[in-house]
Curated annotation (Swiss-Prot):
Tissue expression notes: Expressed by the venom duct.
Name the record gives this protein: Gamma-conotoxin-like TeA53
Disulfide linkage: 49-63, 56-67, 62-72
Recorded family membership: Belongs to the conotoxin O2 superfamily.
Pro-sequence residue ranges: 20-42
Coiled coil: none
Compartment(s) where it occurs, according to its Swiss-Prot or TrEMBL record: Secreted
Length: 81
């Protein structure tokens, strides 16, 4: 009877350890996925600035340093245009 009790206790400890490990793995996976940027944002952002045709509100947000208040332009147009 004592051997059966010890066996049941060991089984319970092993099962609870496995459940705890799975929970921590799931939590780590959720944290990793929540830190990812949406695919479109990853594609348009490069080095902290927006590439051509990315959304912007000011020139400094664009790699080309040229924002038309909506999207980044490919290059800055000459001022006489």
């Amino acid at each position: 009877m004592q051997k059966l009790t010890i066996l049941l206790l060991v089984a319970a400890v092993l099962m609870s350890t496995q459940a705890l490990n799975q929970e921590q793995h799931q939590r780590a996976k959720i944290n990793l996925l929540s830190k990812r940027k949406p695919p479109a944002e990853r594609w348009w952002r490069w080095g902290g600035c927006m590439l051509w045709f990315g959304r912007c509100t000011k020139d400094s947000e664009c790699c080309s340093n040229s924002c038309d208040r909506t999207y980044c332009e490919l290059a800055r147009f000459p001022s006489d245009w």
